[in-house]
């Protein structure tokens, strides 16, 4: 019985990862200074954005999301000209690795981050799916091992 429960939990978690792979959306918004809801910290989730003007969760064919920070030399938070834009990008880096780096975008020097995952461009740190799977699996594995040791 315990093994069946563990097996069902594993199948459920694998299906969650598969679902994440099928649907890729990105946040789309832009803020400048204190104007707009796109600035950091970005506190919205997939359901919140439906109520927030100027912020949307859009389907992204490439699966790659981006975040661009423009202005302020060192990108200081208190800079009036600091602009943050979140978007779907047509294609990610050539090596398919999530990353952030200084680059040129629309003829301006910016700090740009690329990530691949559903709504990944809203988070400060990229995808948390592997950590969530590990956190969920450890108690299940521990329970299963204890059951095996008792029998």
Curated annotation (Swiss-Prot):
Which positions anchor the lipid (GPI-anchor amidated asparagine)?
A: 121
Q: Where is the signal peptide?
A: 1-19
Q: Where in the cell is it found?
A: Cell membrane
Q: Which cysteines are joined by disulfide bonds?
A: 26-65, 29-38, 60-88, 100-113, 115-120
Q: Which UniProt keywords apply?
A: Cell membrane, Disulfide bond, Glycoprotein, GPI-anchor, Lipoprotein, Membrane, Signal, Transmembrane, Transmembrane helix
Extracellular face of the membrane: 20-125
The keyword Cell inner membrane is annotated on this UniProt entry? no
Other known facts:
The name 'retroactive' likely refers to the propensity of hyperactive larvae to change orientation within the egg case.
> What is this protein identified as?
UPAR/Ly6 domain-containing protein rtv
Gene from which the chain derives: rtv
